[in-house]
Amino acid sequence: MSKINKLEHIRNIGICAHIDAGKTTTTERILYYTGKSHKIGEVHEGGATMDWMEQEQERGITITSAATTCRWQDKIINIIDTPGHVDFTIEVERSLRVLDGAVAVFDGVAGVEPQSETVWRQADKYNVPRMCFVNKMDRMGADFYRCVEMLKDRLGAKPLVIQLPVGIEENFKGIIDLIKMKAVIWKDEALGAEYFEEDIPADMKDKAEEYRAKLLDMVVELDDHVMEKYLSGEEVTAEEIKRLIRKGTISAVFYPVLCGSAFKNKGVQPLLDAVVDFLPSPIDIGIVKGREVSTGEEKDFLISVTEPFAALAFKIMNDPFVGSLTFIRIYSGKITSGTTVINTVKNKREKIGRMLLMHANNREDVKEASAGDIVALAGLKDTTTGDTLSDIDQQVILERMEFPEPVIELAVEPKSTADQEKMGLALSRLAAEDPSFRVSTDYETGQTVIKGMGELHLEIIIDRMRREFKVEANIGAPQVAYRETITKVCEIDYTHKKQSGGAGQFARVKIIFEPLKEVKDLKDEDKNKIFVFESKIIGGAVPKEYIPGVEKGLNNIRETGVIAVYPMIDFKATLVDGAFHDVDSSVLAFEIAAKAAFREGMPKGNPKLLEPIMQVEVITPDEYMGDIIGDLNSRRGQIQSMDPRGNAQVVTANVPLAEMFGYVNTLRSLSQGRAQFSMIFSHYDQVPSQVADIIKAKK
């Protein structure tokens, strides 16, 4: 593919949704029709191009975000296919951070499902413009209009319907394009490559007119001139409608809704047209937030080829042929192989070696990349997810990503001494790839503990350790990742002194600890953090160079809380005063003082134990509803809602994760295998005192 330098010709998009809504199948069809793939891969056969890890092909689900580049009309589309399973939410999170637009795929039968809501909220957080593709219109029970209502009710979104389905279930044969007011019908035998326009079927004329009027009512509001034209009865042209749909989509006034059946090869080409027509180019996004290293000043940086180089690393991946690959999104400037850049987060220089354009796990070497591109760099030494790579002379740090706290953990130990060293290497490599996966050592037992977002997440980590690194390990039972916090403000004044012979140590710190939810003037960028540190030192009571030691000490010690040695979260520490000695003070002395101040001060803050609460959604036939609700209540669950969906009932409840182990078997026996459930992490909440006593006793 020849390089197009014009930023307006690039679309960086993600395809995301609930598990099984058909994201990967939709992406496969896109690759086929854009000429990237000469054979369509089917997910259920384990042949999908984008699902390239062995585990993905066996399980038929997408675990990591595969990135690929393709071409439609005169535009370059960089696509990231993201997982829909809740345990891999981090993959969605980091993809959305670097994308300019997204296609949210919905199952035409199930509509808006729990993970769809999670992904939608994540996209809201990063202000990603998006459009909706209601898939599986050929399936029994598919209902396009109900899906549109669910977009309003469950997501609070403003859908802009631009297509209607022609036929339903097995009779689904095409769409009505409400912009052109034409029907688009596919020929079955031609793998969807052949389709033709015809007049709207007579029995759908009224519905098409109704939805066309709704479409026009919404778009003309964005342009006074077009509105006047519309109100005076003049025809609004297709070009004007497209321009206003683009304007409204980019500013998130509404979300265009399309439909089709990716599996049956219907509706994919108009979806590609809509990606090009309505989703933003990097120029439409315009700026990226960050700060200048030299001044520390927060500012907006222009997305432009002519600005100094700045890129964000959003994924690390181990490739069996190339080694470690770092995926970057270039926001400004350009880079060539052989250039040296700086990782401004770690203050380490990195030399750019091989630069690759990725097509799932196939690769194409490129010598140059510029603003708007998503490329993979081979052989970077110190760069991890969320780091900024920058021009050495004009250094910037781009806004970082927030990573969720793990909710489940288990102990692993190597089966033999030969596996010991290999296991350490394997786990550190896997942790570098995935920021929601953590590795630590239990300081009491010396065991290695791995932590993640769910049982499937850790199961796949262990599986990869065995397959890719040939490490055999014994696995403990899953444990809940409890946390600790404080519930009231407390203050501690602590002096660390060691001045008896030899080099001395001296540091005094006065720190105020307070619960984050009680901090009145919390900055916006701190609202999603679990620990915030601030220095209010005036007049040099503690020299500037020692203050990072205080923050480092607190950050390290908070990993072992004061109730039952669980990590301490959701608090702010403010350094308000202190003292130093000209000879005996050092960064290390202040680090030690901060740790001791934490140990002494935190018990005064009325510390409490926290547990992860999951949002559980159960879909069940009517007759099992009573038993299922009773069982959820017995698990300390709080029922949030009960809604009919088709001929089933949907129960939503908040339930502690500790009570959900083995739930799949209970649900199976309560409903004779007819109910299904999904759960996603909701929040941390205080553990009831009688339960907390049991947890403390076990520690």
UniProtKB/Swiss-Prot annotation:
Residues 8-283 form the tr-type G domain. The keyword Nucleotide-binding applies. It holds the Pfam family GTP_EFTU. GTP binds at residues 17-24, 81-85, 135-138. Disulfide bonds: none annotated. Its main location: cytoplasm. It comes from the Bacteria. GO terms for biological process: ribosome disassembly. One of its GO terms (molecular function) is translation elongation factor activity. It is found in: Cytoplasm. Keywords: Cytoplasm, Elongation factor, GTP-binding, Nucleotide-binding, Protein biosynthesis. One of its GO terms (cellular component) is cytoplasm. PANTHER family: RIBOSOME-RELEASING FACTOR 2, MITOCHONDRIAL, TRANSLATION ELONGATION FACTOR G-RELATED. Catalyzes the GTP-dependent ribosomal translocation step during translation elongation. During this step, the ribosome changes from the pre-translocational (PRE) to the post-translocational (POST) state as the newly formed A-site-bound peptidyl-tRNA and P-site-bound deacylated tRNA move to the P and E sites, respectively. Catalyzes the coordinated movement of the two tRNA molecules, the mRNA and conformational changes in the ribosome. Belongs to the TRAFAC class translation factor GTPase superfamily. Classic translation factor GTPase family. EF-G/EF-2 subfamily. This is Elongation factor G. It comes from Rickettsia parkeri. The gene is fusA.
